[in-house]
Amino acid sequence: MKYRSNETFTHKQADKIGVLITNLGTPEAPEKGALKRYLREFLSDTRVVEVPKLIWWMILNLVILNIRPKRSAHAYSTVWTDRGSPLMFHTQDQTNALATSMQQKYGDKVVVDFAMRYGSPSIESVTQNMLEKGVRQLLVLPLYPQYSGATNGSTFDALGEVLRKTRWIPDVRFISHYHDFTPYIDAVAGSITEHWATHGRADKLIFTYHGIPKRYLTAGDPYHCECYKTSRLVAEKLGLGKHEYMVTFQSRFGREEWLQPYTDHTLKSLPEQGVKSVQMICPGFSADCLETIEEIGIENRDYFLEAGGQRYEYIAALNAQPQHIAALESLIEKNLGGWECPDRNSQLSADLATAMGSDK
């Protein structure tokens, strides 16, 4: 194997700390072709779909990629904005806010950037760019508060694949989850409190999370437990009793059993149980995207109202809200503990290297 080297390195270059923010990714446009490329990459990840490769290759290429892109393109077109994909611009806003904060505290010693697990900007391209800027200590923060092998684990795989091909590997720290991190819990609770201040409360507060196949749970994935813990901690912060909130799981795909209760089934059944108003929040999504805006904000709203519900409200994701940025900043600071960029004499380093025959 030919290992990738830093062609721009010089001995005058200052060592830096890198903070890499990651999220899932998004198609380049709400069009069939773009969706097909995105879905092929996403659904080819064995962390996401744990099915024998040959069987899944046939299902994916002969069935799914011939049907789903067109339907998904239509769904994306309903949430696309002048700034593009909501997930993309919210992640950019989060990164910009964190970069500004880090710049104020550390100057040019800390580099903050973001990458997507699927699509662009890729983890590979952004990581290599950070290394070329002199990053020798790299902190990676996937914006998935609750750990799952399909998200956080997959991100680690992608990072590992990049570093496996890199000659000079930096020190690396990886934040695998933050589902019970107090500032994050406070930020979620704060967004709910702010919504209540304007709209009042509903009969039921529903925490809805992206689902995963149930067999992932039985195989040892902690995601289910971490979703429930996040919800419990937020509910305790808000002073809610057990009957005032519930946890559901959305976005199931395929025919096998996923984590239950299902969000759509729950919303269809609540009105007949006397629940006439609900407020929905998605603590597992750090930024609004198709699954929150369209699936929860529109599709599931229709299910509830058609079943006899009278009031349905979606509480937006934390996005780049100040309390969320403060929580992420606190999380980053905690995990940077002990890392420092030494104030070395770069000119002296260059002179000594030149004396020993280096041309860089």
Swiss-Prot record:
InterPro entries xref list: Ferrochelatase, Ferrochelatase_AS, Ferrochelatase_C, Ferrochelatase_N
Pathway assigned to this chain's UniProt record: Porphyrin-containing compound metabolism; protoheme biosynthesis; protoheme from protoporphyrin-IX: step 1/1
Reaction it catalyzes: heme b + 2 H(+) = protoporphyrin IX + Fe(2+)
Binding site for Fe cation: H210, E291
BP term (GO), one: heme biosynthetic process
Keywords tagged on the record: Cytoplasm, Heme biosynthesis, Iron, Lyase, Metal-binding, Porphyrin biosynthesis
GO MF term (any one): ferrochelatase activity
E.C. code: 4.98.1.1
Pfam families: Ferrochelatase
Gene Ontology CC: cytoplasm
Compartment(s) where it occurs, according to its Swiss-Prot or TrEMBL record: Cytoplasm
Role played: Catalyzes the ferrous insertion into protoporphyrin IX.
Family: Belongs to the ferrochelatase family.
Protein name: Ferrochelatase
Species for this entry: Pseudoalteromonas atlantica (strain T6c / ATCC BAA-1087)
Lineage, highest ranks first: Bacteria, Pseudomonadati, Pseudomonadota, Gammaproteobacteria, Alteromonadales
